[in-house]
């Protein structure tokens, strides 16, 4: 397609964009003029503002000025190579990107201050209402005891030392500070699905499918689990000790149970019919298997009315 045809096809879109831009510029200009008049009339006190917001306003204003200058030169047919406005735009954009972490940290405080300035009071669910008040740490009983001690000291006049009951102690802030929990149910569900997807991607089913359809050479390893190696070392140490000291060591019930569990973990027969949950990858709802959520055995509690069986004494 020739260049004149391209210009003719883009001309209606360019005219529509210019009209829209002109309308937006007029609306923004009217709003800025209204705010300027109110600020000059001291309707909005700006003496105690945030310097970060002021810096952002100045940077955005400079960015718009350089961008307008760049658009003007481009519309006039000038070259943008080595243009000083391009370097300034890159610098301002970099500074604005670096300010994003500060915006995220101050977002909650700024929103709270704006809401307080509009409504004139804090909301009932504001987390700052739950902060510790040092005045509430003073007990009324201690203040009454202090007054009684001072009255007794005034009457007796024996010594000018105060009693240790009413002495003011240094306030120690609590270690657990109340934090505002703003996580929604949708975000919690999203995190749960992400964990299920990671678990499904690392399952043995997906790993075997990758090995089956992969063109890479198959790698065969002969390794032992860490708990099996540790158990073998302990058994060998026990055997060496028994042979050297000529003593048979007793094995507790806990040790027997631990060995039994280790043997079950090392065997591969229990996992022949076990398949991991990959419903998170297929669009289904992930569920907990019996291995992930085992049922706890109930402890047998003896009844109070029963008596222990004992040996009968022979006569």
Swiss-Prot record:
Specify whether Acetylation is a keyword of the entry. yes
Q: What is this protein called?
A: Neuroguidin
Provide the protein's localization.
Nucleus; Nucleus, Nucleolus; Chromosome, Centromere; Cytoplasm
Oligomer status and interactors = Part of the small subunit (SSU) processome, composed of more than 70 proteins and the RNA chaperone small nucleolar RNA (snoRNA) U3. Interacts with CPEB1 and EIF4E.
The record's region (Disordered) falls at 123-174, 252-315
Q: Which residues carry this modification: N-acetylalanine?
A: 2
Q: Which residues form a coiled coil?
A: 5-42, 181-205
Which species does this protein come from? Answer: Bos taurus
Instruction: Give start-end positions of Polar residues composition bias.
Output: 264-276
Record keywords? Acetylation, Cell projection, Centromere, Chromosome, Coiled coil, Cytoplasm, Nucleus, Phosphoprotein, Repressor, Translation regulation
């Amino acid at each position: 397609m020739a260049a004149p045809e391209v210009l003719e096809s883009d001309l209606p879109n360019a005219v529509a964009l210019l009209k829209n831009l002109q309308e937006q510029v007029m609306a923004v200009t009217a709003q800025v003029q209204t705010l300027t008049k109110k600020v000059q009339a001291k309707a909005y006190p700006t003496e105690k503002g945030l310097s970060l917001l002021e810096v952002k306003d100045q940077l955005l204003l400079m960015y718009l000025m350089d961008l307008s200058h760049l658009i003007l030169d481009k519309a006039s047919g000038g070259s943008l190579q080595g243009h000083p406005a391009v370097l300034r735009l890159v610098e301002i954009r970099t500074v604005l990107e670096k300010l994003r972490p500060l915006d995220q940290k101050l977002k909650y405080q700024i929103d709270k201050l704006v809401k307080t300035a509009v409504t004139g009071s804090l909301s009932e669910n504001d987390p700052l209402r739950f902060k510790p008040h040092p005045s509430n740490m003073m007990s009324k009983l201690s203040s009454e005891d202090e007054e009684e001690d001072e009255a007794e000291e005034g009457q007796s006049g024996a010594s000018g030392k105060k009693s240790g009951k009413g002495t003011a102690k240094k306030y120690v802030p609590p270690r657990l500070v109340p934090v505002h929990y703003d996580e929604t149910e949708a975000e919690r569900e999203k995190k749960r699905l992400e964990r299920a997807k990671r678990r499904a991607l690392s399952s043995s089913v997906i790993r075997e499918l990758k090995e089956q359809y992969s063109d890479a050479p198959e790698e065969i390893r002969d390794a032992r689990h860490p708990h099996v190696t540790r158990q073998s070392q302990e058994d060998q140490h026990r055997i060496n000790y028994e042979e050297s000291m000529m003593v048979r060591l007793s094995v507790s019930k806990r040790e027997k149970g631990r060995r039994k569990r280790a043997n079950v973990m090392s065997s591969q027969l229990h996992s022949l019919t076990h398949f991991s949950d990959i419903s998170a990858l297929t669009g289904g709802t992930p569920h907990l298997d019996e291995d992930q959520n085992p049922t706890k055995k109930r402890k047998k509690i003896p009844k109070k009315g029963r008596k222990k069986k004992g040996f009968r004494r022979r006569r």
